[in-house]
Amino acid sequence: MAGLKRRASQVWPEEHGEQEHGLYSLHRMFDIVGTHLTHRDVRVLSFLFVDVIDDHERGLIRNGRDFLLALERQGRCDESNFRQVLQLLRIITRHDLLPYVTLKRRRAVCPDLVDKYLEETSIRYVTPRALSDPEPRPPQPSKTVPPHYPVVCCPTSGPQMCSKRPARGRATLGSQRKRRKSVTPDPKEKQTCDIRLRVRAEYCQHETALQGNVFSNKQDPLERQFERFNQANTILKSRDLGSIICDIKFSELTYLDAFWRDYINGSLLEALKGVFITDSLKQAVGHEAIKLLVNVDEEDYELGRQKLLRNLMLQALP
C-alpha cells in the first residue's frame, strides 16, 4: 500500500540514473500521463479492461497513474512497449497525451536572448522616438551592406574538404598563451560567427549496383559473410560522389537569420542544386537518380545569434 500512496512529486528510485541520460523512468512517465487523465477517463479505461484486471486490482485504481501501474503489473506495458497505452489513449480520444508517452525528457523552454533584446529595444528606443518626432526624417545614408550570403570558404576543384577544424588535443603551454592573447576580443571590435555548411551528393539507390556484384563461394558462413561485406563496402566507396564543407562567416544578425530561414524552408537546398548537380555530374552518373544533402548545425546557429547580439548592443550604446 505504501507504493500506491506515492505522491506524483516524489522521485522514483530508478529515476536517479536515467536523469543523467536525459530520460524519464517508466514510472515517471506514468506520473506525467496519469495526472492528465480525468476520473471519467479512468472509469472508461477500467471498464475496457474489466476482463483483464481482476476485481481486487481494479478496486485499488484511484487515478490514471494507478491504472498505468496496473497495466505494468499485468505485463501490458514496459520500457520497450507503449503500444497498449497509445491505443487506449486513442480510444478515449485523448490524442493530446500521445506526445507524453515517451521516456525522452523534454528540453526546458528558454527565452531567446536575441528576441528578448529586440523586444526590449523596440519599446525602449523606437517608441519614444516615434512619439517625439511627429515629422518623418529623410533617410540617412546607410553603411555599406554586405551581400545577402557572405563569401564562403570552399574549394573549387572538386568535392574536397576545404578548411578542417584543428584536432582536439592537449596543447602546449606556449600555444595556450598565444591563444589567450589572440582569442581575447576587442570590446569595440565587431563580432563575427562561423556557420559550417555541409553539402553532399549521393545516389538515391544502391541496390541495383549491389545486386549481382556481391558474391562469395567460401564454405565457412562467417568467411562468406565477411567477403560479401568487403565487396559491398568497396562498391559503395567507389560510388561516393564526395562532399564539400564550407565555413560561412556572418557579421550581421539579419543575414544569419535569413540564411537559417532559407535552410529550414528548403530554399537553400534548391539553390545549391543548381551549383553542385551540374551537367558533368549528371553525365558521369548516367541514368541513375542522385540527391543533394545539405546540413547546418543548429547549435552553431544558436551560438552565432548570441554572438552577433553583441553587435546590436554596441550599436545601441550612445
UniProtKB/Swiss-Prot annotation:
SUPFAM superfamilies given in the database record: DEATH domain (SSF47986)
Keywords: Apoptosis, Cytoplasm, DNA-binding, Nucleus, Repressor, Transcription, Transcription regulation, Ubl conjugation
UniProt-listed GO biological process terms: decidualization; extrinsic apoptotic signaling pathway via death domain receptors; negative regulation of protein catabolic process; negative regulation of transcription of nucleolar large rRNA by RNA polymerase I; regulation of apoptotic process; spermatogenesis
Positions of the DED domain: 25-103
Location in the cell: Cytoplasm; Nucleus, Nucleolus
SMART domains listed in its UniProt record: DED
GO cellular component: cytoplasm; nucleolus
Tissue specificity note: Widely expressed with highest levels in testis.
CDD domains: DED_DEDD
Region (Disordered): 128-147, 160-191
PTM remark: Exists predominantly in a mono- or diubiquitinated form.
InterPro entries linked to this entry: DEATH-like_dom_sf (IPR011029), DED_dom (IPR001875), DEDD/DEDD2 (IPR038856), TRADD-like_N (IPR049341)
Pfam family of the protein (one): DED
GO molecular function: DNA binding
Keyword Cytoplasm belongs to the record: yes
Record bears the keyword Transcription: yes
Subunit structure: Interacts with CASP8, CASP10, KRT8, KRT18, CASP3 and FADD. Homodimerizes and heterodimerizes with DEDD2.
Protein function: A scaffold protein that directs CASP3 to certain substrates and facilitates their ordered degradation during apoptosis. May also play a role in mediating CASP3 cleavage of KRT18. Regulates degradation of intermediate filaments during apoptosis. May play a role in the general transcription machinery in the nucleus and might be an important regulator of the activity of GTF3C3. Inhibits DNA transcription in vitro.
Protein name per the record: Death effector domain-containing protein
Name of the gene: DEDD
